[in-house]
A protein has these predicted regions:
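Glycine-rich, N-terminal phosphate-binding loop and its surrounding beta-alpha-beta segment
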Residues: 58-116
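Extended accessory regions or peripheral subdomains of proteins
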Residues: 1-31, 36-75, 112-195
């Protein structure tokens, strides 16, 4: 059952809780970790972990693909308006809580080239990496690690105990050590770099 404000349960404290849980989720599509970096700074208070979105939006150029359950739709409408419509349908509208900075909703990537949908920009940059202009997941749950209060909060707009069981059932996925697949090489000449 969906709730207006999320149900919250507290998990045992561990400073590395974000990495601990994310290591079990990182293999899932749309899993994300926003990490504070453990810095002693007011803006480094929280780590946020999400995965398993209820909906995703991906924009390349003029097309946005919205994927919800088994349904995929493509639109050329303004991607930010499409995102707002999807958020409205998800009906995730929690009240402000300074101890829970993210209580579900949209999390993702807004690339510089998304600006081309709203204003004319010069076409001087080389597209040297293939990334969407926008890639956003809509999440109805999150894990929030608060490094000031030393709390780990699992919140969900649906059954929080079912989400906890799901989270705890995720298995660690061993990762291979990083290795180069080819020699290092520059993407520009020394002269180009100096310009």
């Amino acid at each position: 059952m969906k709730t207006l404000s999320p149900a919250v349960i507290t998990l045992p404290w561990r400073q590395d809780a974000a990495e601990f849980y994310f290591s079990r989720l990182s293999h899932l599509p749309w899993a994300m970790l926003l990490h504070s970096g453990y810095a002693d700074h007011p803006y480094s208070r929280f780590d946020i972990v999400v995965a398993d979105p209820i909906c995703t939006l991906t924009t390349f150029g003029k097309e946005t693909v919205v994927s919800e359950s088994e349904k995929r739709t493509t639109t050329t409408d303004d991607p930010l308006q499409v995102l707002q419509q999807v958020l409205d349908r998800a009906d995730i509208r929690p009240t402000h809580n300074e101890d829970l900075p993210f209580q579900g909703g949209a999390l993702g990537l807004f690339g510089y080239d998304l600006g081309r949908r709203f204003e004319s920009l010069p076409e001087i940059a080389e597209q040297d990496i293939v990334l969407p202009d926008m890639a956003v997941g809509i999440y109805d749950w999150a894990l929030i690690v608060d490094h000031q209060r030393h709390t780990v909060s699992l919140l969900s707009h649906n059954d929080v105990n079912a989400r906890r069981a799901w989270l705890e059932s995720q298995q660690f996925s061993p990762q291979e050590d990083f290795t180069l697949t080819s020699d290092w090489q520059s993407n520009m000449t020394r002269e180009q770099y100096g310009e």
